[in-house]
Regions:
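Generic protein-terminus/edge-of-domain signal
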Residues: 1-67, 74, 82, 99-111, ...
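Hydrophobic/aromatic-rich alpha-helical bundle segments in the mid-to-C-terminal region
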Residues: 144-145, 167-174
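Basic/polar phosphate-binding segments, predominantly the helix-turn-helix DNA-binding elements
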Residues: 159, 188-212
Length: 212
């Protein structure tokens, strides 16, 4: 199954058995998301609503058709204003793809500490076209569905990597804010997953309220 219109699971890591899975979601539920991470990579394509995505100490207020690259194990959470409908595509991607170069953009996002792709209208239309074709193919049961869906997924990821690796996106320092204390805390958690990570211990180490 490549496609689902059911809600994206909110467990700490989630589960993905196939190479990738595409979600197209629209809801207006009042939900609080805790900090979490996944064992797979994630692409978020924001379509409409009011949302801010927090990833490893950086906060990105989103505009329609903004794209976020969330590397596996990156600690993140969305902050959603439920006063308006929230619509997005979510793409989950396994780490053991046959073509590993398609995952280069996630490592580069981590290296740059920058996860946002904001596109010019021309590049935006190109990715929209591929994405909608991918959605249509993933939904159908027609002849060759698996082959075409895989090909469209690879095409989408090739263009996404070209855009991000070659910095063809629109960069604006005002497109995000940075919390150095939260970033330091999350980095500590990432590197000490076997240590005592209780709320009390972390609050004491970083001098923050455990209710923060």
């Amino acid at each position: 199954m490549f496609f689902t219109d059911q809600n994206e699971p909110s467990e700490k890591t989630g589960y993905l058995n196939e190479a990738f899975r595409l979600f197209h979601l629209r809801d207006q539920a009042s939900r609080e998301f805790s900090w979490h991470y996944h064992d797979f990579h994630k692409v978020v394509i924001f379509l409409s609503g009011k949302a801010t995505y927090h990833i490893e100490g950086r906060s990105y207020p989103l505009k329609p058709w903004d794209i976020l690259l969330v590397d596996r194990h990156a600690i993140h959470r969305p902050e959603i204003d439920s006063s308006v409908p929230y619509e997005r595509f979510i793409l989950w991607i396994q780490n053991d793809l046959p073509y590993q170069e398609l995952l280069s953009c996630f490592q580069k996002a981590r290296d740059r500490s920058y996860n946002l792709i904001r596109l010019s209208s021309g590049l935006q239309e190109k990715l929209k076209e591929i994405l909608f074709q991918l959605e249509d193919s993933a939904r159908t049961q027609a002849f060759g569905q698996d082959i075409l869906t895989q090909a469209l997924f690879q095409e989408f990821m090739v263009y996404l990597n070209r855009i991000f690796l070659e910095k063809q996106y629109i960069y604006d320092k005002k497109s995000y804010s940075y919390d150095s204390q939260i970033a330091s805390l999350l980095q500590y958690i990432n590197h000490n997953l076997q240590a005592d990570l209780s709320v009390e211990k972390l609050a004491s180490r970083y001098y923050v309220s455990k209710y923060h």
